[in-house]
Amino acid sequence: MIIAEGYDCAIRVGYLQDSNLIARRVGPIHGKLLASPGYIHAHGAPETPDQLAQHEALMQGTETWQFMDGDKTLTVRPQGRFKADNGAALVAAATAGLGVAYLPDCLTHDHVAAGALVPIMTRYPPPPAGAYVIRPPGQHPARKIRVLTDLLIEHFGQSPHFAGTDAE
């Protein structure tokens, strides 16, 4: 798509699929499976990936969710009626008690600290995703792409919400 649209590069967040584009990881994206206290009170909290099938999932689309069980990666295809392509909308739906959501720490840190969202299924953490600068293959990247990439790497390195810690 970036080639057809004429873009020099794009930023992709998540797990990279195989493609013919060049990708440079600029930082990790850590997340958690979360639910509101109200949702947990009404429906309980899943304790294993298999139990997610009995819960409403708040999703971006038809994605799969991955969880770690020791050194094994478990993949689950959650089901749910609420779908949004906007992280803020998914956070709002989760805090409103509409279901469970796998969300990045950078969007949910304050909500978790305030008690509006609660980490669930913590025995099965999701593997860290990544933020990538992607570009068409071919020549060396233009200076503006290298500068953008370097700035993003610096930002991810300095922000506690992207470092995989529960920084206060």
Predicted segments with their positions:
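A ligand-binding cleft/hinge motif common to bilobed small-molecule-binding domains
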Residues: 91-117
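Alpha-helical segments flanking ligand/cofactor-binding loops in enzyme cores
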Residues: 24, 50, 91-92, 146
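C-terminal effector-binding regulatory domain of bacterial HTH transcription factors
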Residues: 106-110, 114, 124-168
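Short helices/loops that flank or line small-molecule/ion binding pockets
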Residues: 1-7, 88-97
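Short beta-strand->loop
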Residues: 23-26, 79, 114-126
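Acidic, Gly/Pro-rich loop/turn segments at junctions of secondary structure
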Residues: 1-84
